[in-house]
């Protein structure tokens, strides 16, 4: 950067100062008593910097101090006020606005430069000697003192109701941690060390020792601590009057830093903090008074983080480090005293950093030269500062800084500074929350302000040095506190002159989010003193800002504009309490404070009006206007009530009153978010790692004018700690069973529990669950009349509410019909369920009169209503009541009918109901009548009752003819009449509830129907008119699809041709709809001859068939038998090009009415064609083929000539066209095979296709048609393919080719079929398992289309996994090794084989040698040992099937696996695992059996003898348990249902007379008698079907 001297002003360009606004100064760290600073106070993402200080003329022990830079990267410490305050006219201001820490997820970050990476600002730690904390004191009683009355105790005055004349509103303390009340310096007792320096202590920095903040982590609850008393009550913050006095001597006083929010530390650490604070002030004062500085300042700034791990820091100047860290045990005077002469614009001074740090509780310790007063007067002259490092400075440190003038374009683009070596030993960070620094003369104020003006550049240099310090700072700092404390205390007591410096900052420096981001610890340490100091500073700061705004007017830097925008976006409005601010850890809170990048944040500038009290007027009357006081509304100190504050209800509020601010839209780019996209206002205490969030992009360009404002946004505060109490209604509705009045009686509780169980059962009642639920009902205790009536009411209400389930509810009542209970009023008598139920039904049936009364009343109300809204409401209520009554009546009638069908009601009662309903001619009664007759008509309409029924129906017909009722009712009556005429067989199926089996069955039928319709539709689509096709004979045909129909060939099974075995054609050959060869679909010639004699007369259309040449090759060998494809082939029409192998039929009239063909010589109309064909039909005798008449022969002259050619080429045509036809026939074969699973039939059909070389089409169709179906379907298809290959009906080449067509598209198909690789493996596995094709051959062929897409390994792993389930890991590994295959050949290049196998769990394949367990000699295990091992695996270890397979194969050979010993041990272990003992009863856990079915199936292997051994083992296990009732029957049921044991094995066990197995056999047989009875009955039924 080129150095460019600034002649007009030594300060940075500043934006216009805007009116101050009330903010929440909560960023000051709370100084809390604690032991030594913890070793890790600062987070790893924050920098810690040390700044050297100037030598002071006072006897003050000097040492390096650490300062923590604030959130303001490149902008000076001032930000425009919110929109609700007036905006001054645009003009240059001495401060830059910038985003506050609340604008980012973390409290500190680095300046954003467009072309430079963002670095995080770091806490600058001012190491000083640390002295052991003094003895802790107990918590003191709260005393409230008035600083304007010399510290007079006014506690009693306030408690007694007298108003306090304190100029600041009460500043509440956070409620999270109880702390004693804070005190102002003028209020503290004599023995307490003063935090604000005395007159002589101009060096007292406006920042607190970092140690104080660090130490606060040690102890959560601070204790009162003596503080130094200021010799003068005026040692508060500088008053505005004094500030004005200094205006003439300072050019930019506003930059003076003093933490406005200074919580007076009541802890022992205050002493050290005060000591450190006394050291820091001279630096800021001295520096601020100098207009020009040399690069030595930069050097010292960069060297200010000695011995610490330095990190590159963004710097405004490019600084080259030329010195190395040196020994630290040297005196201060020997250390780097370098003259500094650099233009203030070029030197990034620490002033703003000081300002920031002071506000957040950290001060830079800078020593001022002795000539401070003189230098103050020379604003443009270069100044030589001698900076001394008090302790352990390096002998030689030299930084070469190339200053450059800071212009609007250059500020944002400074390069980061390289890491600088440590210059001094690390010290404990010092945080001084002092709000005012008193100096010996007004020039000190000027000095401090000047230093602040240089903050832009110096802070950037410092920010990097601090990054690596944090791990060391606390280690060596403890020992240096004592010296500094002593000197500071001495100085503070010496100072006799009450000169004060205004060290406050504009209130807008600290953004609302900055305050809200402070931790719970920071909020706790807020003092009332802090607010007073803020008030005293504001006026002075305003005057200094006005003065500075007159002298410096450079253009605004674009980066600053961006910052201004960011401030507006994120920091415009003060946020009362930031979510999670209290839950941030203490360490984070310290960092948050120390790292906020501007001291401006803590100063609160309040507009003192002429008529109101001012801090300079100590004796004046304290009165303020409303706006002034409202400025304090959302300060954290005002929001949170102190712990020990007395309950002054008139003054102190318990809760904050949130203002309702208008909502504004937040720019999503600026709104800070956490890593999970949580916005900042919902950040519940989470500290975002990594410092600040993403830098603000393109923000400055949206605010080009300083005065441009955005409307305030609404602050949404969410408290996660606050319990939200919902308002409870006094008379809230509760369910009857939960009301307290009923809960007292134990009998009532039992009754309600009974009703609850009945409701639960009723809700679950379905036809499928009926038996199971009825068992539960039978177990209920219904022993009183009240309970019985309650149960009946529940059942009845449920039945009439759900008429479709009335059958189930009626059956439930049938089961309960015998239930009797004693009557309540007559103890000797009983009442039964049936009587009460019928009474309930009758009461509901006769309820219509009561309903009519209700309806009449509502109708009168409706007629009397005058208002339209009232009429509408009443009308709706009336209609709703009628509808409800109608539905209840219909439900009741339906329920009554079902009860009658179950013989619970007599026939006479039903006739009475019918008569009653017929008498009432209202629509509701007639609808009920229809529903009743539909339900019970068939049962009432028997021979004896027919005359009565005739009367009913005659009356109904009369009602229909009279047409006095609505059409809906008339149609309902007519439907019932028609139903009786149809012998009560409904046209529609019953729409009641169905079982799962019924639903599945109907779904399967529906699916088949849909497939048939789709196939018909596809056939019709191929007949679209106007599409010309050229057949093999060269004929152009126009296919018309008008009115075309395809019929099921099963309806034409007996229609055959009387002569040759050729197809029937109703129109010329190329016409699309010609019939197939007979509707039989290709019967062989012999079959056709046999049928011809008996059925030839049926084929009346045989004369329409064109004459076939004698040389024509019959097509029967390749035709497909219709018997095999009735379900799927009936919908298939012929192809447009009229292949000679038709497979479908069509109506004759379809083609009589179809479009004319091009082979017709004349353009005769369709009517003429139809007429000629009908005349021909009439002439048929049915015995012989008749030649066409002369006209037709003439028309077909061309076709006749082409006929021989076609017949000669028939074989070639068949081959050329067979692929598409073969696809269709293959689909038919596969559909039928999957439906009936007849391998023999399917193989015969494939053989009849006679399409060697084209069977790859069959394979492809098989794969495609089963790919998305069930696993069993794919397994069956794989088995069929294996058998075809095994029988050599399907060649391996066709097999591979058929699969390859699918494999080429498999990767794309995986999008729609995610498990396609598993499905393909299921189709292939049977081939490998049975050895139809070798592993090597299949793997190589299948991988060819998959290698380009890198999926070969995936498919191969799925195949191997399936093989492991069916064979064993050992065998699969052997197969792989025998195939001599390498995984590298099947995986994408660069993929690690071992990792792939581990991921796919195929690592067992890698090992060439068997595992150790397999290598062991397989000794013969006894039955007991086998059982114990298997029991441990299955019951204790709960091993999965794979583990059991592995163990068995590792320990047993093939002979042992088939031995009865092993089979019995396995069956015993599985059955034992499945037995559940409930007290004295036993039952079977069918889930365990189902889980172990694969193991049983594998080793029993469907072998009857092995299954018999398993049954013997089961019998022995039951005998050991003393044969619990029904346990063996349950096992038999489960094993039979899961198809583990076959019927033959059960019968064999039943009839077995083996003497070794007779123990308990008789009892076992007796217990399963019902099972065998059911088994035989089921077998007989299947035979009958």
Swiss-Prot record:
This is Eukaryotic translation initiation factor 4 gamma 3. Residues 1-36, 128-190, 208-232, 305-332, 567-620, 686-711, 729-749, 860-880, 1017-1042, 1072-1219 are annotated as: Disordered. Residues 699-1019 are annotated as: eIF3/EIF4A-binding. Residues 1571-1585 are annotated as: Necessary but not sufficient for MKNK1-binding. The lineage of its organism: Eukaryota, Metazoa, Chordata, Craniata, Vertebrata. One of its GO terms (molecular function) is mRNA binding. Changing residue 756 to D: Reduces binding to EIF4A. The gene is EIF4G3. SUPFAM superfamilies: ARM repeat. It comes from Homo sapiens (Human). Residues 1221-1343 form the MI domain.
């Amino acid at each position: 950067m080129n150095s460019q001297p600034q002649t007009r002003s030594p300060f940075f360009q500043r934006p216009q100062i805007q009116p101050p606004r009330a903010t929440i100064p909560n960023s000051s760290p709370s100084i809390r008593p604690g032991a030594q600073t913890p070793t890790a106070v600062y987070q790893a993402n924050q920098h810690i910097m040390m700044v050297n200080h100037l030598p002071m003329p006072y006897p003050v022990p000097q040492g390096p101090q650490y300062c923590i830079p604030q959130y303001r990267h490149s902008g000076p410490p001032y930000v425009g006020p919110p929109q609700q305050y007036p905006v001054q006219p645009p003009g240059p201001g001495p401060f830059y606005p910038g985003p506050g820490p609340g604008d980012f997820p973390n409290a500190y970050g680095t300046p954003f430069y467009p072309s430079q990476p963002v670095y995080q600002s770091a806490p600058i730690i001012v190491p000083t000697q640390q002295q052991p904390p003094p003895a802790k004191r107990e918590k003191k009683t709260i005393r409230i003192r008035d600083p304007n009355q010399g510290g007079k105790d006014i506690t009693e005055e306030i408690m007694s109701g007298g108003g306090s004349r304190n100029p600041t509103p009460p500043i509440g303390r956070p409620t999270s941690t109880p702390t004693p009340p804070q005190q102002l310096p003028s209020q503290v007792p004599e023995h307490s060390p003063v935090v604000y320096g005395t007159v002589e202590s101009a060096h007292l920095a406006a920042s607190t020792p970092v140690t104080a903040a660090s130490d606060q982590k040690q102890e959560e609850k601070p204790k009162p601590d003596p503080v130094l008393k200021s010799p003068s009550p005026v040692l508060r913050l500088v008053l505005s009057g004094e500030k004005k006095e200094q205006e003439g001597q300072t050019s930019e006083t506003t930059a003076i830093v003093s933490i406005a929010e200074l919580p007076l530390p009541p802890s022992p650490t205050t002493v050290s903090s005060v000591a450190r604070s006394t050291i820091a002030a001279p630096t800021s004062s001295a520096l601020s008074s100098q207009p020009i500085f040399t690069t030595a300042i930069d050097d010292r700034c960069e060297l200010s983080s000695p011995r610490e791990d330095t990190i590159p820091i963004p710097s405004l100047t490019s600084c080259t480090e030329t010195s190395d860290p040196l020994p630290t045990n040297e005196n201060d005077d020997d250390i780097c005293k370098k003259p500094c002469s650099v233009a203030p614009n070029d030197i990034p001074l620490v002033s703003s950093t000081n300002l920031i740090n002071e506000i957040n509780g950290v001060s830079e310790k800078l020593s001022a030269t002795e000539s401070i007063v003189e230098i103050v007067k020379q604003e443009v002259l270069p100044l030589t500062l001698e900076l001394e490092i008090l302790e352990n400075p390096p002998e030689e440190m030299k930084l070469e800084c190339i200053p450059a003038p800071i212009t609007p374009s250059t500020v944002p683009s400074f390069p980061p500074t390289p890491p600088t070596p440590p210059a001094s030993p690390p010290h404990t960070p010092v945080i001084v929350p002092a709000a005012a620094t008193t100096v010996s003369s007004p020039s000190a104020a000027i000095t401090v302000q000047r230093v602040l003006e240089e903050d832009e550049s110096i802070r950037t240099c410092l920010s990097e040095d601090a990054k690596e310090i944090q791990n060391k700072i606390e280690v060596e700092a403890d020992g240096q506190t004592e010296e500094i404390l002593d000197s500071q205390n001495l100085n503070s007591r010496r100072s006799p002159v009450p000169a004060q410096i205004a060290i406050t900052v504009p209130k807008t420096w600290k953004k609302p989010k900055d305050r809200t981001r402070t931790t719970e610890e920071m909020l706790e340490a807020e003092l009332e003193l802090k607010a007073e100091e803020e008030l005293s500073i504001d006026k002075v700061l305003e005057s200094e800002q006005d003065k500075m705004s007159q002298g410096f007017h450079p253009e605004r830097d674009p980066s600053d504009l961006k910052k201004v925008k960011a401030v507006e976006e994120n920091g415009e409005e003060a946020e009362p309490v930031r979510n999670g601010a209290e839950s941030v850890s203490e360490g984070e809170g310290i960092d948050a404070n120390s790292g906020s990048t501007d001291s401006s944040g803590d100063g609160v500038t309040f507009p003192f009006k002429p008529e109101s009290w001012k801090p300079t007027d100590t004796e004046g009357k304290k009165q303020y206007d409303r706006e002034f006081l409202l400025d304090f509304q959302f300060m954290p100190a005002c929001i949170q009530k102190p712990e020990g504050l007395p309950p002054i209800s008139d003054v102190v509020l318990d809760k904050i009153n949130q203002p309702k601010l208008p909502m504004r839209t937040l720019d999503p780019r600026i709104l800070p978010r956490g890593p999970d996209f949580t916005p900042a206002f919902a950040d519940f205490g989470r500290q975002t790692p990594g410092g600040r969030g993403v830098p603000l992009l393109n923000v400055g360009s949206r605010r080009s004018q300083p005065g441009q404002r955005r409307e305030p946004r609404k602050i949404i505060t969410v408290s996660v700690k606050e319990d939200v109490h919902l308002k409870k209604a006094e008379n809230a509705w509760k369910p009857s069973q939960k009301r307290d009045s009923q809960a007292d009686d134990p009998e009532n509780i039992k009754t309600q529990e009974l009703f609850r169980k009945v409701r639960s059962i009723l809700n679950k009642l379905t036809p499928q669950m009926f038996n199971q639920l009825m068992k539960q009902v039978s177990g209920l205790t219904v022993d009183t009349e009240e309970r019985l009536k309650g149960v009946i009411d529940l059942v009845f209400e449920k039945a009439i509410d759900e008429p479709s389930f009335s059958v189930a509810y009626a059956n439930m009542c049938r089961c309960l019909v015998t239930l009797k209970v004693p009557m309540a009023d007559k103890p000797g008598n009983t009442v039964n369920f049936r009587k009460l139920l019928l009474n309930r039904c009758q009461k509901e049936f006769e309820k219509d009169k009561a309903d009519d009364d209700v309806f009449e009343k509502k109708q009168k109300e409706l007629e009397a209503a005058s208002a339209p809204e009232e009429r509408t409401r009443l009308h709706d209520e009336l209609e709703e009541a009628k509808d409800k009554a109608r539905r209840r009546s219909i439900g009741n009638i339906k329920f009554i009918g079902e009860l009658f069908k179950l013989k619970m009601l007599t026939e006479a009662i039903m006739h009475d109901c019918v008569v009653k309903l017929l008498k009432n001619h209202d629509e509701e009664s007639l609808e009920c009548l229809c529903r009743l007759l539909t339900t019970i008509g068939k049962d009432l309409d028997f021979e004896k009752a027919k005359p009565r029924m005739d009367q009913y129906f005659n009356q109904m017909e009369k009602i229909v003819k009279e047409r006095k009722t609505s059409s809906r009712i008339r149609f309902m009556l007519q439907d019932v009449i028609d139903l009786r005429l149809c012998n009560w067989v409904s046209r529609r199926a019953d729409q009641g509830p169905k079982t799962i089996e019924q639903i599945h069955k109907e779904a399967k039928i529906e699916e088949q129907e849909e497939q048939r319709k789709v196939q018909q539709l596809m056939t019709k689509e191929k007949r679209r008119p106007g599409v010309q096709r050229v057949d093999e004979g060269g004929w152009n045909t126009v296919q018309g699809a008008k009115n075309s129909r395809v019929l099921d060939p099963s309806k034409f099974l007996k229609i055959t041709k009387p002569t040759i075995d050729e197809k029937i054609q109703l129109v010329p050959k190329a016409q699309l709809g010609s019939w197939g060869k007979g509707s039989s679909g290709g019967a062989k010639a012999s079959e056709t001859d046999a049928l011809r004699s008996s059925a030839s007369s049926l084929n009346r259309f045989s004369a329409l068939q064109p004459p076939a040449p004698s040389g024509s090759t019959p097509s029967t060998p390749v035709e497909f038998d219709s018997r095999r494809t009735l379900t799927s082939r009936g919908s298939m029409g012929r192809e447009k090009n009229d292949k000679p192998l038709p497979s479908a039929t069509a109506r004759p009239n379809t083609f009589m009415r179809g479009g004319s063909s091009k082979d017709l010589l004349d353009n005769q109309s369709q009517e003429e064609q139809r007429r000629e064909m009908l005349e021909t039909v009439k002439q048929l005798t049915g015995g012989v083929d008749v030649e066409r008449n002369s006209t037709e022969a003439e028309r077909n002259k061309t076709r006749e000539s082409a006929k021989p050619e076609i017949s000669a080429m028939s074989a070639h045509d068949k081959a050329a066209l067979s692929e598409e036809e073969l696809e269709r026939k293959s689909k038919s074969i596969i559909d039928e095979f999957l439906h009936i699973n007849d391998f023999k039939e399917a193989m015969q059909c494939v053989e009849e296709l006679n399409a060697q070389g084209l069977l790859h089409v069959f394979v492809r169709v098989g794969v495609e048609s089963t790919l998305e179906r069930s696993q069993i379907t794919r397994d069956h298809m794989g088995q069929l393919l294996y058998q075809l290959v095994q029988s050599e009906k399907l060649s391996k080449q066709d097999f591979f080719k058929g699969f390859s067509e699918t494999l080429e598209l498999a990767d794309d198909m995986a999008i729609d079929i995610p498990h396609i690789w598993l499905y393909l493996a299921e189709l292939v596995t049977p081939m490998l398992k049975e050895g139809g094709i070798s592993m090597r051959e299949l793997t190589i062929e299948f991988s060819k289309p998959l290698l380009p897409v890198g999926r070969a390994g995936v498919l191969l792993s799925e195949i191997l996994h399936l093989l492991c389930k069916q064979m064993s890991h050992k065998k699969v590994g052997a197969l792989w090794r025998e195939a001599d295959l390498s995984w590298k050949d099947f995986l994408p290049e660069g993929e690690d084989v071992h990792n792939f196998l581990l991921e796919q769990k195929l690592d067992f394949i890698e090992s060439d040698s068997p595992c150790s367990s397999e290598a062991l000699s397989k000794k013969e295990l006894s039955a007991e040992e086998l059982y114990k091992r298997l029991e441990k695996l299955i019951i204790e270890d709960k091993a999965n099937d794979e583990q059991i397979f592995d163990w068995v194969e590792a320990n047993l050979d093939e002979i042992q696996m088939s031995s009865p010993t092993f089979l019995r041990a396995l069956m015993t272990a599985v059955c034992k695992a499945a037995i559940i003992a409930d007290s004295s009863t036993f039952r079977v856990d069918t889930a365990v059996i189902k889980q172990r079915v694969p193991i049983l199936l594998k080793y029993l292997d469907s072998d009857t003898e092995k299954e018999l051994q398993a049954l013997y083992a089961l019998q022995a296990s039951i005998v050991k348990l003393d044969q619990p009732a029904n346990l063996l029957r349950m096992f038999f049921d489960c094993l039979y249902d899961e198809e583990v044991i076959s019927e033959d094995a059960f019968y064999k066990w039943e009839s077995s007379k083996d003497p070794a197995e007779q123990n308990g056999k008789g009892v076992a047989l007796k217990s399963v008698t019902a099972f065998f009875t059911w088994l035989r009955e089921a077998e007989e039924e299947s035979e009958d079907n």
